[in-house]
Amino acid sequence: MRILALTITLVLSGALSCGDPVHSDAVDALGADVTAPGPTHRAGQPCLVCHGGLGPSSKEFSFAGTLYKAQTTKDALEGATVALTDAKKGKASAKSNNVGNFYIEATSFMPEFPARVQISFPDGATQVMVTHIGHDGSCASCHADPRSPHSPGHVWLVDDPAFFPGMPPQ
């Protein structure tokens, strides 16, 4: 009887501790979080690694990312609107916060891929993503720094920071 109880305990322990090792590695690769959890943490990182339904966060997003003012800077773009349209013309939008982060909770919008996206700023400046989003609503899954043959770099509003809305002419 003791052997049976021990066997059941070991099997259940193993089953409960098993998870998706690829997902666990992706979470571990993010490194330590240097800010408190919340809407301003982990700017520039692939949000859906933790918020994509597999955890460790219980808050699930369908889309999330970080916006920057210009292609060549890491200055956060606060107050921009991210507008998404999915394959069935479903729409959702979100505003970027003080570190440039935005997110759309999965409970309010679950897209049918592919999706299209554009960002706009209150002064009328707009950036439309030329390609579609095929399957992953985490911007940083494709838009990683630094820019390379495998990534266009982070998401930005203007190419040159000198032309950022509201900046005085140089």
Segments and roles (model prediction):
Residues G14-S17:
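C-terminal motif of bacterial Sec signal peptides marking the signal peptidase cleavage site
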Residues G19-P21:
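Bacterial signal peptide processing site
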Residues R42-L54, D136-R147:
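The canonical Cys-X-X-Cys-His
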Residues P56-S58, T66-L77, G166:
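Structural motif
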Residues T72-K88:
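Short, ordered, surface-exposed loop/turn motifs in non-cytosolic proteins
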Residues K88-V99:
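Short, acidic Ser/Thr/Gly-rich low-complexity loop/linker segments typical of extracellular
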Residues V99-S108:
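Short, surface-exposed beta-strand/beta-hairpin micro-motifs centered on an aromatic residue
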Residues P111-D123:
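A short, solvent-exposed beta-strand micro-motif common in secreted/extracellular proteins
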